[in-house]
Amino acid sequence: MFERFTDRARRVVVLAQEEARMLNHNYIGTEHILLGLIHEGEGVAAKSLESLGISLEGVRSQVEEIIGQGQQAPSGHIPFTPRAKKVLELSLREALQLGHNYIGTEHILLGLIREGEGVAAQVLVKLGAELTRVRQQVIQLLSGYQGKEAAEAGTGGRGGESGSPSTSLVLDQFGRNLTAAAMEGKLDPVIGREKEIERVMQVLSRRTKNNPVLIGEPGVGKTAVVEGLAQAIVHGEVPETLKDKQLYTLDLGSLVAGSRYRGDFEERLKKVLKEINTRGDIILFIDELHTLVGAGAAEGAIDAASILKPKLARGELQTIGATTLDEYRKYIEKDAALERRFQPVQVGEPTVEHTIEILKGLRDRYEAHHRVSITDAAMVAAATLADRYINDRFLPDKAIDLIDEAGARMRIRRMTAPPDLREFDEKIAEARREKESAIDAQDFEKAASLRDREKTLVAQRAEREKQWRSGDLDVVAEVDDEQIAEVLGNWTGIPVFKLTEAETTRLLRMEEELHKRIIGQEDAVKAVSKAIRRTRAGLKDPKRPSGSFIFAGPSGVGKTELSKALANFLFGDDDALIQIDMGEFHDRFTASRLFGAPPGYVGYEEGGQLTEKVRRKPFSVVLFDEIEKAHQEIYNSLLQVLEDGRLTDGQGRTVDFKNTVLIFTSNLGTSDISKPVGLGFSKGGGENDYERMKQKVNDELKKHFRPEFLNRIDDIIVFHQLTREEIIRMVDLMISRVAGQLKSKDMALVLTDAAKALLAKRGFDPVLGARPLRRTIQREIEDQLSEKILFEEVGPGQVVTVDVDNWDGEGPGEDAVFTFTGTRKPPAEPDLAKAGAHSAGGPEPAAR
């Protein structure tokens, strides 16, 4: 039976349960159903009872007088009484007798009257409403209109007079009266848009085809134009042809929802159109106009657009539509007959200055809602920052959202109880536990003392809460430009908020931080540090990326490692680096994988490997590894990124690169490093050799890349070849990783100077850079140490010292061997492991 209930009838049942709980009754009787019918307020039953002077308060007081309040609030499910069940069964019988295939609020009321013996019937009689009179009122309302629920269910009753009611029951069911909302002050003020509103008035005043359609991007204010028209009608600021018009917005979703049988949807729509024709003063607003095309078109049926076309052409129906440019092109323009019936009105995105005026006009509404004060600086910041940093949405929508969320954020912070209140709660709970324990132990003197302590704490907490609520909550919080910047930073991940003193110090020491991982390469470290400082200080070109560099030089000197160190410095994680291996894009057709496949190709829906990552993380470091291996077409696509900081992906979306650091690595010009012609990179071999090599690399880059590509790069940095001294420093860096792993096993690792020197000697290769050192440490240290751990020669709680035998520090060291000695950590020096982890020479063990 319940599947036949309309939404309003189901709501009545829910409200009946709530009324029973409010009265502490553990059952749902006829009186609770009557309260639910009145409480629902919108159905035919509620309107019938209201017309007879029956109010919710009057019924509730009569129920309390007859039955009274219950002793205890019910828990869990509340059952229906047998009499209430009978009422629901009678409501089904009433519906069938009226020829309805649904059960609405009117049928439930008729069931209550037909039952006639319950508390509900007694209450109605006491309030002066004879049952026969109530029944006549319901039938009279149904004869004028076959029920609001009938429109909801899509079916009518039998017979009845074909008069139209004084109220717009169908339009109220499937739409919203915007002029009534404007009269009640429920609509936000509309700032500007005078030209668009005037153009809409002109189209509406035409004799035929007087149907404007507002076309614009999402969030530019199409609906606001219609609300502005509703306010103009209310204030009388419209021509004579539009005075006294009623502007209704139609909800197509409600029209379609619940139309179970063929013809239900069409019947509902025809009822709406009939009521509009009868009234003669209705202007219909259909948001998302493209949903008309195909709406309700099941097999063999016609859609809503086809039903509306004749009336739109003859001028019998005045409609305002609103849709986006893409949807208009995709749906409306394809249907030429529908398109010619609408006159397009373009709604463009407002300027930043216009957006600021809009925000100032809305300020009072948001201040009242969030109970905050919004400064002028916050308005300016919201408009300018949203315009600059949020590129996939449009003004003023994105700026309004910034203001709204900043206000919500501030209000939530103020509503959070201070920590000392939570401390009071913990102390009170602890006192209660101790008191109960004392009572269980029959220590009543202690229990009495704890009871007094509990009372004191409760009183202190109440006083502190009173101070908090009367103090902090009464002070109106202020939303300023800093709050707006913080919200934007949380949205996009772009740090646009003001620099704190700690971050300023950290940025000024950026080179020092990067050199903890990068040995040497002063030029490269300085270049990227300056780019980041320029960005955070707000002095970078707003239309270009934060920085674009080519890192050239031999393999294994730190080009990729510097990119990872930069990502770690900015985001605290090496994985924050967007790394693209350009060796995967050596063919022309593979370029589509980077930026997104075009329509019709495999992978179109997935987006590009580069564009999708940057779109989701606009503040990032992007590394194009070994750029020379990519196809030439990719360089052409990157020109726009380097110059304008944006790129269009395969789906036509603009991806913003203005807050990224772009790094290209290349090995061009380094193939001659192994030839003994004085072309090496070693600084020890003289700065002239480095300058000659730098010139060679630049010449190779000019041969391989087009001038327009190189001309857009901020800086080309040629990395130095690592010297022997830098390799020794790199030993410390790499050993610290091994020491960190041993620390988790309660072990420390210390290398003597001789061990470091031998590792550097065996791992130093001027051609291959630092990578041979990593393999040497793995072979000489990690492999041998792992065997000693497995053989239990060293173990937890020990300091492992690595030294060298059979080497005086001068010769080739072919016969030299590494030795491993484990000694107990001295209890007085618990930080040995930490010292060893930094490989700073640590304290020597007592003996070997």
Swiss-Prot record:
InterPro entries: AAA+_ATPase, ATPase_AAA_core, Clp_ATPase_C, Clp_N_dom_sf, Clp_R_dom, ClpA/B, ClpA/B_CS1, ClpA/ClpB_AAA_lid. SUPFAM superfamilies: Double Clp-N motif, P-loop containing nucleoside triphosphate hydrolases. One of its GO terms (cellular component) is plasma membrane. Residues 5-70 are annotated as: Repeat 1. Residues 80-144 are annotated as: Repeat 2. ATP binds at residues 216-223, 553-560. Residues 171-418 are annotated as: I. Residues 821-848 are annotated as: Disordered. One of its GO terms (molecular function) is ATP hydrolysis activity. Gene3D superfamilies: 1.10.8.60, Clp, N-terminal domain, P-loop containing nucleotide triphosphate hydrolases, UVR domain. This is ATP-dependent Clp protease ATP-binding subunit ClpC1. The lineage of its organism: Bacteria, Bacillati, Actinomycetota, Actinomycetes, Mycobacteriales.
